[in-house]
Amino acid sequence: MIGPTGAVRVMVATKPVDFRKGAEGLAALVRETMRADPFDGAIYVFRAKRADRIKLVYWDGTGVCLFAKRLEDGEFRWPK
């Protein structure tokens, strides 16, 4: 199964990001803007300018996983 097992920290970026970025670009944002290590086992969550899309970046111990979700209707609620 893909994804974390057990308890894991979830870190949410509060500002929208350029959704053309892939796993490496988002990992760089984790380092630069969140001042965190993208390979620490936490899940990092980003949203597009339109709040109907999110991407999650996660290091599973063997590589970087990139998960994406687009809502058909509605928007994700996001912290300010």
Where are these regions (language model features)?
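Polybasic/polar functional segments that serve as interface/processing modules
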Residues: M1-K80
